[in-house]
Amino acid sequence: MDKILKPHEKIGENFRKFYAKFGEDAFVNLKDFFEQEKESFYKEKIAQFRQNHILRDDAVIKARQSWVSVIGRSLEVVIEILVDNFCIKNNLKITNDKILRKTNLKNELDEVKRKILVDFGSVSLLPDGDIIIYKVIPEVKILAILSVKNSFRERYTETPYWKLKLSNQRITKHIKVFMVTPDNDDEISFKGNKKSRVVMEYELDGVYLARDKFDKSKKIKGINDLINDLKALL
């Protein structure tokens, strides 16, 4: 019996086909890909809600709400596909903050967790980390944290905050913090005095845009530059 895929897993499988067809260009066309996926998702969800005798207008609203909860994890899966082959070739591993928040971690992940905690005096907290890249040979060492966001909407200070906290600790100051985003709302893509672009460009180690049109700078680059910058950490 075939496994029933969760929505983000299904989108991940669809992206693998999209990637196979378009190669590296797939990552600069994420907006087109997700528009197609959203249309299919809406159609399927609305049909399901209608079968449960929900009025069409209400079904559309529910489908839209469902998509909002799916898109974030789906984008993370797509970026994981981008970095996965790189990590395999270079004997690196990937985890995330959700996994590290679990109890009874195996020794390796427990060490990763301890080496990424941020000290707040009487308590230590995990920084946000959608994708955490680390190596285990000759010892566990965290190389980079990737924050993956579809858009920001006044949340642009979250990742820079964690970068500052990590930089202030001896054990974590080497960790690079990168932002990966399609920037669907044009909040950081173009030069100007937008706080979001200024803050992230100044505080983060790199911002990688999954789109074709944007103003490039030393730190704000295309998503295809991400792998080269990760190689520099080896």
Where are these regions (language model features)?
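Acidic-basic catalytic patches of nuclease active cores, encompassing PD-(D/E)XK
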Residues: 57-117
